[in-house]
Protein backbone atom coordinates (compact mmCIF):
# COMPACT_ATOMS: atom_id res chain seq x y z
CA UNK A 1 0.00 0.00 0.00
CA UNK A 2 2.74 2.34 0.87
CA UNK A 3 4.43 1.70 -2.44
CA UNK A 4 1.17 2.38 -4.25
CA UNK A 5 0.77 5.61 -2.30
CA UNK A 6 4.29 6.65 -3.23
CA UNK A 7 3.67 5.85 -6.87
CA UNK A 8 0.42 7.83 -6.78
CA UNK A 9 2.12 10.79 -5.15
CA UNK A 10 4.92 10.52 -7.67
CA UNK A 11 2.43 10.36 -10.50
CA UNK A 12 0.57 13.34 -9.03
CA UNK A 13 3.78 15.33 -8.91
CA UNK A 14 4.52 14.40 -12.45
CA UNK A 15 1.02 15.37 -13.51
CA UNK A 16 1.37 18.69 -11.72
CA UNK A 17 4.68 19.33 -13.39
CA UNK A 18 3.23 18.29 -16.71
CA UNK A 19 0.16 20.42 -16.12
CA UNK A 20 2.34 23.40 -15.15
CA UNK A 21 4.55 22.93 -18.16
CA UNK A 22 1.55 22.28 -20.36
CA UNK A 23 0.09 25.55 -19.16
CA UNK A 24 3.29 27.26 -20.17
CA UNK A 25 3.13 25.53 -23.50
CA UNK A 26 -0.53 26.42 -23.88
CA UNK A 27 0.23 30.03 -23.15
CA UNK A 28 2.88 29.97 -25.79
CA UNK A 29 0.94 27.84 -28.24
CA UNK A 30 -1.50 30.53 -29.47
CA UNK A 31 1.41 32.59 -30.69
CA UNK A 32 2.88 29.43 -32.25
CA UNK A 33 -0.34 28.50 -34.02
CA UNK A 34 -1.06 32.05 -35.14
CA UNK A 35 2.34 32.36 -36.73
CA UNK A 36 2.00 29.00 -38.42
CA UNK A 37 -1.43 29.94 -39.78
CA UNK A 38 -0.12 33.14 -41.32
CA UNK A 39 2.79 31.36 -42.96
CA UNK A 40 0.85 28.25 -43.98
CA UNK A 41 -1.02 30.15 -46.75
CA UNK A 42 2.09 30.70 -48.85
CA UNK A 43 4.28 27.64 -47.96
CA UNK A 44 4.27 24.02 -49.14
CA UNK A 45 3.31 21.06 -46.93
CA UNK A 46 6.92 20.40 -46.06
CA UNK A 47 7.47 23.93 -44.82
CA UNK A 48 4.19 23.76 -42.91
CA UNK A 49 5.49 20.90 -40.84
CA UNK A 50 8.98 22.24 -40.25
CA UNK A 51 7.98 25.66 -38.88
CA UNK A 52 6.61 24.66 -35.43
CA UNK A 53 9.86 22.95 -34.53
CA UNK A 54 11.79 26.15 -35.01
CA UNK A 55 9.30 28.16 -33.03
CA UNK A 56 9.18 25.62 -30.19
CA UNK A 57 12.94 25.75 -29.84
CA UNK A 58 12.84 29.52 -29.77
CA UNK A 59 10.21 29.50 -27.04
CA UNK A 60 12.30 27.16 -24.89
CA UNK A 61 15.44 29.15 -25.47
CA UNK A 62 13.69 32.37 -24.51
CA UNK A 63 12.96 31.01 -20.99
CA UNK A 64 16.68 30.84 -20.18
CA UNK A 65 17.72 34.12 -21.87
CA UNK A 66 17.91 37.53 -20.25
CA UNK A 67 15.39 40.30 -20.90
CA UNK A 68 17.57 41.73 -23.63
CA UNK A 69 17.68 38.44 -25.51
CA UNK A 70 13.93 38.14 -25.06
CA UNK A 71 13.49 41.49 -26.80
CA UNK A 72 15.95 40.76 -29.60
CA UNK A 73 14.57 37.38 -30.67
CA UNK A 74 11.03 38.53 -31.53
CA UNK A 75 12.52 41.10 -33.89
CA UNK A 76 14.06 38.23 -35.86
CA UNK A 77 10.74 36.37 -35.95
CA UNK A 78 8.81 39.51 -36.92
CA UNK A 79 11.05 40.08 -39.90
CA UNK A 80 10.47 36.52 -41.09
CA UNK A 81 6.71 36.97 -40.67
CA UNK A 82 6.58 40.24 -42.57
CA UNK A 83 8.61 38.82 -45.40
CA UNK A 84 6.51 35.66 -45.59
CA UNK A 85 3.18 37.52 -45.61
CA UNK A 86 4.17 40.17 -48.17
CA UNK A 87 5.81 37.81 -50.68
CA UNK A 88 3.78 36.13 -53.46
CA UNK A 89 4.26 32.61 -54.78
CA UNK A 90 6.74 33.94 -57.30
CA UNK A 91 8.75 35.54 -54.54
CA UNK A 92 8.71 32.27 -52.58
CA UNK A 93 10.47 30.61 -55.48
CA UNK A 94 13.06 33.35 -55.67
CA UNK A 95 13.94 33.18 -51.97
CA UNK A 96 16.54 30.39 -52.32
CA UNK A 97 18.59 32.84 -54.39
CA UNK A 98 18.72 35.09 -51.37
CA UNK A 99 19.93 32.20 -49.22
CA UNK A 100 22.52 31.26 -51.79
CA UNK A 101 24.11 34.65 -51.28
CA UNK A 102 24.12 34.07 -47.53
CA UNK A 103 25.79 30.67 -48.08
CA UNK A 104 28.50 32.35 -50.15
CA UNK A 105 29.14 34.76 -47.35
CA UNK A 106 29.22 32.00 -44.76
CA UNK A 107 32.29 30.49 -46.49
CA UNK A 108 34.32 33.47 -45.35
CA UNK A 109 33.34 33.05 -41.70
CA UNK A 110 35.26 31.11 -39.03
CA UNK A 111 34.94 27.35 -38.52
CA UNK A 112 32.82 27.85 -35.45
CA UNK A 113 30.34 29.91 -37.38
CA UNK A 114 30.28 27.31 -40.12
CA UNK A 115 29.40 24.61 -37.59
CA UNK A 116 26.68 26.69 -36.02
CA UNK A 117 24.96 27.86 -39.22
CA UNK A 118 23.37 24.51 -40.07
CA UNK A 119 21.52 24.62 -36.77
CA UNK A 120 20.03 27.94 -37.75
CA UNK A 121 19.14 26.57 -41.20
CA UNK A 122 17.40 23.61 -39.55
CA UNK A 123 15.06 26.00 -37.73
CA UNK A 124 14.42 28.36 -40.69
CA UNK A 125 11.92 27.51 -43.40
CA UNK A 126 13.64 29.28 -46.29
CA UNK A 127 17.11 27.59 -46.03
CA UNK A 128 15.87 23.98 -45.77
CA UNK A 129 16.57 23.37 -49.50
CA UNK A 130 20.34 23.79 -49.05
CA UNK A 131 20.84 21.36 -46.11
CA UNK A 132 22.77 18.10 -46.22
CA UNK A 133 21.19 14.66 -46.43
CA UNK A 134 21.58 14.19 -42.71
CA UNK A 135 19.51 17.26 -42.01
CA UNK A 136 16.91 16.09 -44.51
CA UNK A 137 16.60 12.80 -42.62
CA UNK A 138 16.10 14.59 -39.36
CA UNK A 139 13.41 16.79 -40.91
CA UNK A 140 11.57 13.67 -42.19
CA UNK A 141 11.65 12.12 -38.73
CA UNK A 142 10.31 15.32 -37.29
CA UNK A 143 7.53 15.38 -39.89
CA UNK A 144 6.41 11.90 -38.93
CA UNK A 145 6.60 12.80 -35.29
CA UNK A 146 4.47 15.85 -35.82
CA UNK A 147 1.87 14.03 -37.84
CA UNK A 148 1.40 11.46 -35.09
CA UNK A 149 1.48 14.00 -32.25
CA UNK A 150 0.48 17.55 -33.29
CA UNK A 151 0.98 18.80 -29.75
CA UNK A 152 4.51 19.27 -28.40
CA UNK A 153 5.71 16.32 -26.32
CA UNK A 154 8.41 15.77 -23.73
CA UNK A 155 11.08 15.23 -26.40
CA UNK A 156 10.93 18.90 -27.30
CA UNK A 157 11.45 19.85 -23.69
CA UNK A 158 14.52 17.70 -23.43
CA UNK A 159 16.04 19.10 -26.62
CA UNK A 160 15.46 22.70 -25.55
CA UNK A 161 18.01 23.04 -22.72
CA UNK A 162 20.76 21.49 -24.89
CA UNK A 163 20.48 24.38 -27.38
CA UNK A 164 20.24 27.15 -24.79
CA UNK A 165 24.00 27.73 -24.31
CA UNK A 166 25.11 31.34 -24.46
CA UNK A 167 27.81 30.61 -27.01
CA UNK A 168 25.30 28.96 -29.33
CA UNK A 169 22.69 31.70 -29.06
CA UNK A 170 24.66 34.93 -29.33
CA UNK A 171 26.67 33.97 -32.41
CA UNK A 172 23.71 33.05 -34.63
CA UNK A 173 22.16 36.43 -33.83
CA UNK A 174 25.21 38.17 -35.23
CA UNK A 175 25.15 35.98 -38.34
CA UNK A 176 21.46 36.55 -38.80
CA UNK A 177 21.94 40.31 -38.71
CA UNK A 178 24.79 40.09 -41.19
CA UNK A 179 22.66 37.94 -43.45
CA UNK A 180 19.81 40.41 -43.30
CA UNK A 181 21.86 43.53 -44.00
CA UNK A 182 24.49 42.36 -46.50
CA UNK A 183 22.22 40.63 -49.05
CA UNK A 184 20.12 43.81 -49.23
CA UNK A 185 23.23 45.73 -50.24
CA UNK A 186 24.12 43.11 -52.85
CA UNK A 187 20.64 42.99 -54.25
CA UNK A 188 20.76 46.75 -54.80
CA UNK A 189 24.10 46.54 -56.58
CA UNK A 190 23.43 43.43 -58.70
CA UNK A 191 19.73 43.44 -59.60
CA UNK A 192 18.71 47.08 -58.98
CA UNK A 193 15.13 45.83 -58.59
CA UNK A 194 14.43 45.23 -54.86
CA UNK A 195 11.04 45.79 -53.38
CA UNK A 196 12.56 47.91 -50.61
CA UNK A 197 13.80 50.58 -53.01
CA UNK A 198 10.88 51.26 -55.30
CA UNK A 199 11.41 55.04 -55.14
CA UNK A 200 15.01 54.80 -56.28
CA UNK A 201 13.92 52.58 -59.17
CA UNK A 202 11.39 55.15 -60.34
CA UNK A 203 13.90 57.98 -60.04
CA UNK A 204 16.50 56.04 -62.03
CA UNK A 205 13.95 55.14 -64.69
CA UNK A 206 12.86 58.76 -65.02
CA UNK A 207 16.47 59.87 -65.21
CA UNK A 208 17.19 57.31 -67.91
CA UNK A 209 14.11 58.30 -69.92
CA UNK A 210 15.04 61.98 -69.70
CA UNK A 211 18.56 61.28 -70.89
CA UNK A 212 17.22 59.11 -73.73
CA UNK A 213 14.79 61.82 -74.83
CA UNK A 214 17.19 64.72 -74.54
CA UNK A 215 20.19 63.18 -76.29
CA UNK A 216 18.64 62.78 -79.78
CA UNK A 217 17.25 66.33 -79.70
CA UNK A 218 20.68 67.64 -78.76
CA UNK A 219 22.33 65.72 -81.60
CA UNK A 220 19.74 66.88 -84.10
CA UNK A 221 20.24 70.53 -83.17
CA UNK A 222 24.00 70.23 -83.33
CA UNK A 223 23.88 68.53 -86.73
CA UNK A 224 21.40 70.92 -88.29
CA UNK A 225 22.63 74.20 -86.85
CA UNK A 226 26.33 73.80 -87.70
CA UNK A 227 25.99 73.93 -91.50
CA UNK A 228 23.56 76.85 -91.34
CA UNK A 229 25.54 79.25 -89.18
CA UNK A 230 29.05 78.21 -90.19
CA UNK A 231 28.55 78.32 -93.95
CA UNK A 232 26.93 81.77 -94.23
CA UNK A 233 29.64 84.05 -95.70
CA UNK A 234 30.43 87.39 -94.18
CA UNK A 235 30.67 89.16 -97.54
CA UNK A 236 27.78 88.91 -99.96
CA UNK A 237 28.98 88.32 -103.52
CA UNK A 238 30.32 85.53 -105.67
CA UNK A 239 31.18 83.50 -102.57
CA UNK A 240 27.51 83.32 -101.57
CA UNK A 241 25.43 80.41 -102.84
CA UNK A 242 22.36 78.57 -101.74
CA UNK A 243 24.26 75.24 -101.60
CA UNK A 244 25.15 75.81 -97.95
CA UNK A 245 21.50 76.07 -96.98
CA UNK A 246 20.34 73.29 -99.31
CA UNK A 247 22.77 70.85 -97.68
CA UNK A 248 21.34 71.49 -94.25
CA UNK A 249 17.79 71.08 -95.57
CA UNK A 250 18.64 67.77 -97.23
CA UNK A 251 20.27 66.52 -94.03
CA UNK A 252 17.08 67.18 -92.14
CA UNK A 253 14.99 65.36 -94.73
CA UNK A 254 17.20 62.28 -94.62
CA UNK A 255 17.16 62.12 -90.86
CA UNK A 256 13.56 63.23 -90.50
CA UNK A 257 12.20 59.68 -90.12
CA UNK A 258 14.55 58.86 -87.26
CA UNK A 259 15.13 62.16 -85.50
CA UNK A 260 12.66 64.94 -84.75
CA UNK A 261 13.67 68.58 -84.84
CA UNK A 262 11.97 70.82 -82.24
CA UNK A 263 10.74 73.19 -84.96
CA UNK A 264 10.01 70.28 -87.39
CA UNK A 265 12.05 72.02 -90.12
CA UNK A 266 14.77 74.56 -90.59
CA UNK A 267 12.51 76.71 -92.74
CA UNK A 268 10.79 78.05 -89.65
CA UNK A 269 14.05 79.11 -88.00
CA UNK A 270 15.69 82.52 -88.26
CA UNK A 271 18.67 81.53 -90.48
CA UNK A 272 16.37 80.23 -93.26
CA UNK A 273 14.45 83.51 -93.29
CA UNK A 274 17.70 85.45 -93.72
CA UNK A 275 18.19 84.15 -97.26
CA UNK A 276 18.97 86.89 -99.74
CA UNK A 277 19.09 86.68 -103.53
CA UNK A 278 22.57 86.47 -104.98
CA UNK A 279 24.09 89.63 -106.40
CA UNK A 280 24.53 89.74 -110.16
CA UNK A 281 28.11 89.08 -111.17
CA UNK A 282 27.93 91.56 -114.07
CA UNK A 283 27.71 94.55 -111.78
CA UNK A 284 30.99 96.10 -110.78
CA UNK A 285 32.03 98.94 -108.57
CA UNK A 286 32.28 101.34 -111.48
CA UNK A 287 28.75 100.63 -112.68
CA UNK A 288 27.37 101.07 -109.16
CA UNK A 289 29.16 104.40 -108.82
CA UNK A 290 27.75 105.51 -112.20
CA UNK A 291 24.22 104.67 -111.04
CA UNK A 292 24.71 106.68 -107.86
CA UNK A 293 25.96 109.65 -109.89
CA UNK A 294 22.87 109.49 -112.09
CA UNK A 295 20.60 109.48 -109.05
CA UNK A 296 22.34 112.48 -107.48
CA UNK A 297 22.50 114.48 -110.72
CA UNK A 298 18.92 115.68 -110.39
CA UNK A 299 17.70 119.23 -110.82
CA UNK A 300 17.94 121.06 -107.51
CA UNK A 301 14.86 121.57 -105.38
CA UNK A 302 14.93 125.34 -105.87
CA UNK A 303 14.34 125.00 -109.58
CA UNK A 304 11.26 122.87 -108.98
CA UNK A 305 9.88 125.36 -106.49
CA UNK A 306 10.29 128.23 -108.94
CA UNK A 307 8.41 126.23 -111.55
CA UNK A 308 5.69 125.46 -109.05
CA UNK A 309 5.48 129.09 -108.02
CA UNK A 310 4.78 129.95 -111.64
CA UNK A 311 2.15 127.22 -111.78
CA UNK A 312 0.54 128.37 -108.51
CA UNK A 313 0.58 132.00 -109.61
CA UNK A 314 -1.53 130.96 -112.56
CA UNK A 315 -4.10 129.39 -110.17
CA UNK A 316 -4.28 131.99 -107.35
CA UNK A 317 -2.96 135.51 -106.90
CA UNK A 318 -1.65 137.31 -103.81
CA UNK A 319 -5.13 138.50 -102.81
CA UNK A 320 -6.64 135.03 -102.85
CA UNK A 321 -8.53 135.27 -106.14
CA UNK A 322 -8.69 132.04 -108.17
CA UNK A 323 -8.09 131.75 -111.90
CA UNK A 324 -10.77 130.80 -114.39
CA UNK A 325 -12.10 127.28 -113.85
CA UNK A 326 -11.54 127.28 -110.05
CA UNK A 327 -14.06 128.04 -107.33
CA UNK A 328 -14.10 128.04 -103.51
CA UNK A 329 -16.55 125.95 -101.52
CA UNK A 330 -17.01 128.73 -98.95
CA UNK A 331 -18.29 132.24 -99.55
CA UNK A 332 -15.70 135.00 -99.98
CA UNK A 333 -16.08 138.72 -99.42
CA UNK A 334 -14.14 141.98 -99.11
CA UNK A 335 -14.48 144.54 -96.33
CA UNK A 336 -14.02 148.30 -96.30
CA UNK A 337 -10.63 149.35 -94.98
CA UNK A 338 -9.02 145.95 -95.87
CA UNK A 339 -8.32 146.48 -99.52
CA UNK A 340 -8.90 143.79 -102.18
CA UNK A 341 -8.14 140.81 -99.95
CA UNK A 342 -10.74 138.01 -99.95
CA UNK A 343 -11.90 136.69 -96.54
CA UNK A 344 -13.98 133.74 -95.35
CA UNK A 345 -16.02 133.14 -92.22
CA UNK A 346 -14.20 130.90 -89.75
CA UNK A 347 -17.40 129.12 -88.70
CA UNK A 348 -18.33 128.20 -92.29
CA UNK A 349 -14.85 126.89 -93.13
CA UNK A 350 -14.73 124.71 -90.00
CA UNK A 351 -18.13 123.23 -90.87
CA UNK A 352 -17.11 122.39 -94.46
CA UNK A 353 -13.78 120.85 -93.42
CA UNK A 354 -15.31 118.68 -90.66
CA UNK A 355 -14.11 120.50 -87.55
CA UNK A 356 -16.36 120.71 -84.51
CA UNK A 357 -15.86 124.46 -84.12
CA UNK A 358 -13.71 127.29 -85.45
CA UNK A 359 -11.70 127.18 -82.21
CA UNK A 360 -10.50 123.61 -82.99
CA UNK A 361 -9.70 124.58 -86.60
CA UNK A 362 -7.44 127.46 -85.53
CA UNK A 363 -5.89 125.37 -82.77
CA UNK A 364 -5.05 122.41 -85.06
CA UNK A 365 -3.71 124.62 -87.90
CA UNK A 366 -1.59 127.37 -86.33
CA UNK A 367 -0.52 128.64 -89.78
CA UNK A 368 -3.95 130.26 -90.17
CA UNK A 369 -4.30 133.90 -89.14
CA UNK A 370 -7.33 134.60 -87.04
CA UNK A 371 -8.80 138.07 -87.68
CA UNK A 372 -11.26 139.55 -85.18
CA UNK A 373 -14.00 141.77 -86.65
CA UNK A 374 -15.34 145.08 -85.41
CA UNK A 375 -18.94 146.16 -85.02
CA UNK A 376 -18.91 148.11 -88.30
CA UNK A 377 -17.52 145.07 -90.16
CA UNK A 378 -20.21 142.85 -88.68
CA UNK A 379 -22.83 145.36 -89.78
CA UNK A 380 -21.43 145.20 -93.31
CA UNK A 381 -21.69 141.39 -93.34
CA UNK A 382 -25.29 141.56 -92.09
CA UNK A 383 -26.17 144.00 -94.90
CA UNK A 384 -24.51 141.68 -97.49
CA UNK A 385 -26.54 138.73 -96.19
CA UNK A 386 -23.49 136.76 -95.02
CA UNK A 387 -24.37 136.97 -91.31
CA UNK A 388 -27.63 136.74 -89.38
CA UNK A 389 -28.83 139.78 -87.46
CA UNK A 390 -28.58 138.04 -84.08
CA UNK A 391 -24.76 137.68 -84.61
CA UNK A 392 -24.31 141.41 -84.99
CA UNK A 393 -23.29 141.96 -81.36
CA UNK A 394 -21.27 138.75 -80.99
CA UNK A 395 -17.56 138.26 -81.43
CA UNK A 396 -16.72 136.83 -84.89
CA UNK A 397 -13.48 135.75 -86.60
CA UNK A 398 -12.61 135.70 -90.29
CA UNK A 399 -9.75 134.08 -92.29
CA UNK A 400 -7.94 135.16 -95.49
CA UNK A 401 -8.92 132.95 -98.47
CA UNK A 402 -5.31 132.50 -99.68
CA UNK A 403 -4.26 131.05 -96.30
CA UNK A 404 -7.14 128.58 -96.39
CA UNK A 405 -6.05 127.49 -99.86
CA UNK A 406 -2.40 127.02 -98.83
CA UNK A 407 -3.38 125.12 -95.65
CA UNK A 408 -6.02 122.76 -97.08
CA UNK A 409 -5.49 122.86 -100.85
CA UNK A 410 -8.11 121.05 -102.91
CA UNK A 411 -10.29 120.38 -99.84
CA UNK A 412 -11.46 123.99 -99.89
CA UNK A 413 -12.04 124.03 -103.66
CA UNK A 414 -15.34 123.23 -105.34
CA UNK A 415 -14.05 123.29 -108.91
CA UNK A 416 -10.60 122.75 -110.33
CA UNK A 417 -7.65 120.59 -109.34
CA UNK A 418 -4.06 121.33 -108.35
CA UNK A 419 -0.86 119.34 -108.04
CA UNK A 420 -0.41 118.32 -104.38
CA UNK A 421 3.41 118.19 -104.70
CA UNK A 422 3.56 121.79 -105.79
CA UNK A 423 1.23 122.67 -102.96
CA UNK A 424 3.59 121.07 -100.40
CA UNK A 425 6.60 122.78 -101.92
CA UNK A 426 4.99 126.16 -101.44
CA UNK A 427 4.38 125.45 -97.76
CA UNK A 428 7.98 124.23 -97.27
CA UNK A 429 9.29 127.39 -98.92
CA UNK A 430 7.45 129.48 -96.29
CA UNK A 431 5.70 131.74 -98.75
CA UNK A 432 4.71 135.03 -97.14
CA UNK A 433 1.16 135.68 -96.16
CA UNK A 434 -1.17 136.62 -98.91
CA UNK A 435 -2.21 139.90 -97.25
CA UNK A 436 1.09 141.07 -95.75
CA UNK A 437 0.54 144.59 -97.00
CA UNK A 438 -2.70 144.78 -95.05
CA UNK A 439 -1.46 142.96 -91.95
CA UNK A 440 -0.48 146.20 -90.16
CA UNK A 441 -4.05 147.39 -90.50
CA UNK A 442 -5.39 144.36 -88.63
CA UNK A 443 -2.80 144.76 -85.87
CA UNK A 444 -3.61 148.39 -85.33
CA UNK A 445 -7.37 147.97 -85.56
CA UNK A 446 -8.35 144.64 -84.09
CA UNK A 447 -5.11 143.03 -82.93
CA UNK A 448 -5.55 139.91 -85.05
CA UNK A 449 -3.44 136.83 -84.24
CA UNK A 450 -2.09 133.94 -86.23
CA UNK A 451 -3.86 131.39 -84.06
CA UNK A 452 -6.02 131.24 -81.00
CA UNK A 453 -3.12 129.96 -78.89
CA UNK A 454 -1.05 133.14 -79.48
CA UNK A 455 -1.63 136.12 -77.19
CA UNK A 456 -3.12 139.34 -78.50
CA UNK A 457 -0.52 141.84 -79.69
CA UNK A 458 -2.77 144.83 -79.10
CA UNK A 459 -6.15 145.24 -77.49
CA UNK A 460 -9.07 145.41 -79.85
CA UNK A 461 -11.33 148.41 -80.00
CA UNK A 462 -14.23 146.42 -78.55
CA UNK A 463 -12.21 145.40 -75.51
CA UNK A 464 -10.82 148.88 -74.73
CA UNK A 465 -13.88 149.86 -72.64
CA UNK A 466 -14.09 146.55 -70.80
CA UNK A 467 -13.58 146.78 -67.02
CA UNK A 468 -10.38 145.59 -65.50
CA UNK A 469 -10.49 142.49 -63.30
CA UNK A 470 -11.12 142.89 -59.58
CA UNK A 471 -8.17 143.38 -57.29
CA UNK A 472 -7.69 143.36 -53.52
CA UNK A 473 -8.19 147.09 -53.12
CA UNK A 474 -11.48 146.97 -55.01
CA UNK A 475 -12.77 144.26 -52.71
CA UNK A 476 -11.91 146.35 -49.62
CA UNK A 477 -13.71 149.38 -51.01
CA UNK A 478 -16.78 147.29 -51.73
CA UNK A 479 -16.78 145.96 -48.16
CA UNK A 480 -16.43 149.46 -46.70
CA UNK A 481 -19.26 150.76 -48.87
CA UNK A 482 -21.53 147.92 -47.78
CA UNK A 483 -20.85 148.58 -44.09
CA UNK A 484 -21.47 152.32 -44.57
CA UNK A 485 -24.78 151.59 -46.30
CA UNK A 486 -25.92 149.28 -43.51
CA UNK A 487 -25.08 151.83 -40.81
CA UNK A 488 -26.96 154.52 -42.69
CA UNK A 489 -30.04 152.31 -43.00
CA UNK A 490 -29.98 151.58 -39.27
CA UNK A 491 -29.83 155.28 -38.47
CA UNK A 492 -32.89 156.03 -40.58
CA UNK A 493 -34.80 153.23 -38.88
CA UNK A 494 -33.96 154.57 -35.45
CA UNK A 495 -35.11 158.07 -36.42
CA UNK A 496 -38.42 156.71 -37.61
CA UNK A 497 -38.96 154.86 -34.34
CA UNK A 498 -38.29 158.01 -32.34
CA UNK A 499 -40.71 159.99 -34.52
CA UNK A 500 -43.48 157.46 -33.91
CA UNK A 501 -43.00 157.52 -30.17
CA UNK A 502 -43.08 161.31 -29.99
CA UNK A 503 -46.19 161.42 -32.12
CA UNK A 504 -48.11 158.96 -29.96
CA UNK A 505 -47.05 160.66 -26.74
CA UNK A 506 -48.35 163.98 -27.99
CA UNK A 507 -51.72 162.45 -28.90
CA UNK A 508 -52.10 160.93 -25.44
CA UNK A 509 -51.35 164.27 -23.78
CA UNK A 510 -54.00 166.05 -25.83
CA UNK A 511 -56.60 163.44 -25.07
CA UNK A 512 -55.99 163.64 -21.31
CA UNK A 513 -56.33 167.42 -21.29
CA UNK A 514 -59.62 167.23 -23.15
CA UNK A 515 -61.01 164.66 -20.83
Curated annotation (Swiss-Prot):
Subcellular location: Nucleus
Biased composition (Basic and acidic residues): 7-37, 50-59, 73-85, 94-103, 116-125, 140-226
Major localization class: nucleus
A Pfam family annotated for this UniProt entry: CRC_subunit
GO cellular component terms attached to this protein's record: chromatin; nucleus; SWI/SNF complex
UniProt keywords, alphabetically: Activator, Chromatin regulator, Nucleus, Transcription, Transcription regulation
Region of interest called Disordered, as start-end residue ranges on this chain: 1-226
Polar residues composition-biased segments: 126-136
InterPro entries in UniProt: Chromatin_remod_comp_subunit, CRC_Rsc7/Swp82
Record GO biological process: chromatin remodeling; regulation of transcription by RNA polymerase II; transcription initiation-coupled chromatin remodeling
Subunit structure: Component of the SWI/SNF global transcription activator complex composed of at least arp9, arp42, snf5, snf22, snf30, snf59, sol1, ssr1, ssr2, ssr3, ssr4 and tfg3.
Family of this protein: Belongs to the RSC7/SWP82 family. SWP82 subfamily.
Function field: Component of the SWI/SNF complex, an ATP-dependent chromatin remodeling complex, which is required for the positive and negative regulation of gene expression of a large number of genes. It changes chromatin structure by altering DNA-histone contacts within a nucleosome, leading eventually to a change in nucleosome position, thus facilitating or repressing binding of gene-specific transcription factors.
Protein known as: SWI/SNF global transcription activator complex subunit snf59
